[in-house]
Design a protein with these regions (language model features):
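Conserved strand-to-loop turn within each blade of WD40 beta-propeller repeats
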Residues: 23-26, 65-68, 109-113, 152-155, ...
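A structural motif specific to WD40 beta-propellers
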Residues: 38-41, 81-83, 125-128, 167-170, ...
Length: 264
């Protein structure tokens, strides 16, 4: 699929996987037909790079966050229906997400201003502002069947929050800037991708199961091949037992979770 004129920052598929939305540093979001690979429409309205995009559970609403600090709500006709104009973030909006367990749904946004905000999706009224990180918030993940929200930051910490009641739950130092966080509902783990590897936090026991899974470059002729690589992205297979990870050496590494609760 081609069409964007700059980096693609995030992609979200609709529930039936027939369509995809892509956010880009070119300031637009594109709606794609997955089967044909063609652009159906473009969401135009942000003044700078679009850093994140998310879809509502019925695929009828799209939320976007941008370097221009704006949060926008769109419909499937690519019309911007609302731009948040009160209690906005004071820096780039790095992550946007929907939370569907509560009715009406909530929107969650993270920013380079070091905060996370929770909004009522019906009127985009601010409900909570989470403070605690000391640098840009780079990643969020939500457990849909609970009230847990995890955040990761360039300050090298992860925090877990109660998204409904607006309370802080726990904080852990990962000793390295955090690129991605991902809950495992099967094992009550939080998997953390950092600039130096992968950590696995057992949430009930509040201790690291895997500290720390590091990888080095597969290119033996590189002068820095013995230095730890950065893990940049994480995704679970549908069965929750296989973890896919993207790394800074252009490789995808796959890990299987064994019965003794350790990554192999």
């Amino acid at each position: 699929m081609t069409g964007h004129s700059h980096f693609v920052s995030e992609i979200k598929l609709t529930g039936d996987s027939r369509f995809a939305f892509s956010a880009s540093w070119d300031g637009t979001v594109r709606l794609w037909n997955v089967a044909t690979g063609r652009t159906i429409s473009k969401l135009i309205g942000h003044k700078r790079d679009v850093l994140s995009v998310a879809l509502s559970s019925d695929d009828r609403q799209i939320i976007t966050g941008s370097l221009d600090r704006d949060i926008k709500i769109w419909n499937t006709r690519s019309e911007c229906k609302f731009t948040v104009d009160k209690n906005q973030h004071t820096d780039a909006v790095s992550v946007v997400r929907f939370y569907h367990a509560k009715k009406p749904a909530l929107c969650v946004t993270a920013s380079w201003d070091k905060t996370i905000k929770v909004w009522d999706n019906l009127y985009m009224t601010l409900l909570h502002t989470f403070c605690g990180h000391k640098a840009q918030v780079t990643t969020l993940d939500i457990v849909e069947n609970s009230a847990f929200l995890a955040s990761g930051s360039r300050d090298g910490t992860i925090m877990v929050w109660d998204i409904v009641n607006g309370k802080w739950f726990t904080k852990h130092d990962c000793d390295s800037p955090v690129n991605a966080v991902l809950f495992s509902q099967k094992l009550y783990w939080l998997v953390i991708a950092t600039q130096t590897g992968i950590k696995v936090l057992n949430l009930p026991e509040q201790k690291f199961v895997q500290d720390e899974l590091r990888e080095t470059s597969l290119k033996q002729n590189e002068s820095d091949s013995d230095k730890p690589l950065s893990c940049t992205s994480l995704a679970w297979a549908k069965n929750g037992q296989i973890l896919y990870s993207g790394w800074s050496d252009n490789h995808i590494r796959v890990y299987e979770i064994d019965s003794s609760d350790s990554a192999q």
